C-alpha cells in the first residue's frame, strides 16, 4: 500500500463500481496574478483541510512542482464552506478543492467575485501522473462556472465504492443494482 496504507496491505477490499471523477480545482481571484502552479509562490493559498484528499493532493502537486508550503506566503486551512467568502474578501489568493462538477462551493466563488480556474498542467504534472497511477489527466468543463468558458486541464481521481471482500455476493449485487436502477436519484 501507499500513504496511510503503507506497510499494511488491505487484501479484504473490493471495488464495486466507480461513481464520478473528482478533479483538483484550483481557483484564484482574477486580480491575484495566478495563471499557473509556479505563480502560487508567495501567495496565500488554501491547500485544503488537514487530513483531506484535497490537502494530500495539493501537497503532492506542490512537491512535484518543486514548491514547498514554505514558498507560499501562507498555506491556509480554511473550511470548505468558508472558501468562497474568504477568497472574495481577499483573505486568500487561491484555494484548492477536489470535487465533482458542477459544485455549489465553486459556483459561489465564481458568482461572488471575479475568479479564474488555474490550469494544473506542465512537466511536473506529467511526472506526477506517471508516478502516481491513481491520478489521471482530466478537465473541468467549460461553461459550468461564471468566467470559465473553455475546459480547464487538471488532474483527478475517481470516486469508487469500496466494500469488504467478506460482503456476500448477493448483497454486493443488490447495492450495485439499487444504485444503477436509481442512478438519477443517487446523484
Regions found by a protein language model. Give the residues of each.
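Short helix-capping segments at alpha-helix termini
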Residues: 8, 65-71
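Pocket-lining segment of extracytoplasmic ligand-binding domains
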Residues: 3, 32, 69-168
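Periplasmic-binding protein-like
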Residues: 181-187
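Short, glycine-/small- and polar/acidic-enriched structural segments
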Residues: 1-42, 46-49, 59-60, 117
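Short, solvent-exposed amphipathic alpha-helical segments in soluble enzyme
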Residues: 62-64, 112, 177-181
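Short amphipathic alpha-helical coupling segments at ligand-binding clamshell hinges
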Residues: 168-178
Amino acid at each position: 500500500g501507499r500513504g496511510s496504507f503503507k506497510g499494511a496491505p488491505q487484501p479484504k477490499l473490493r471495488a464495486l463500481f466507480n461513481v464520478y471523477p473528482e478533479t483538483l480545482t484550483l481557483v484564484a481571484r482574477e486580480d491575484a496574478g495566478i495563471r499557473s502552479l509556479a505563480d502560487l509562490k508567495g501567495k496565500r493559498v488554501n491547500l485544503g483541510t488537514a487530513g483531506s484528499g484535497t490537502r494530500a493532493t495539493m501537497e503532492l502537486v506542490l512537491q512535484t512542482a518543486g514548491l514547498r508550503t514554505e514558498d507560499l506566503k501562507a498555506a491556509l486551512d480554511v473550511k470548505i464552506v468558508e472558501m468562497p467568502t474568504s477568497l472574495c474578501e481577499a483573505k486568500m489568493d487561491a484555494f484548492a478543492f477536489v470535487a465533482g462538477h458542477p459544485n455549489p462551493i465553486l459556483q459561489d466563488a465564481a458568482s461572488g467575485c471575479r475568479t479564474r480556474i488555474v490550469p494544473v498542467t506542465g512537466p511536473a504534472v506529467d511526472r506526477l501522473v506517471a508516478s502516481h497511477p491513481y491520478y489521471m489527466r482530466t478537465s473541468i468543463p467549460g461553461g459550468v462556472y461564471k468566467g470559465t468558458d473553455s475546459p480547464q486541464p487538471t488532474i483527478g481521481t475517481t470516486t469508487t465504492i469500496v466494500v469488504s471482500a467478506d460482503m456476500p455476493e448477493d448483497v454486493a449485487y443488490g447495492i450495485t443494482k439499487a444504485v444503477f436502477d436509481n442512478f438519477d436519484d443517487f446523484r
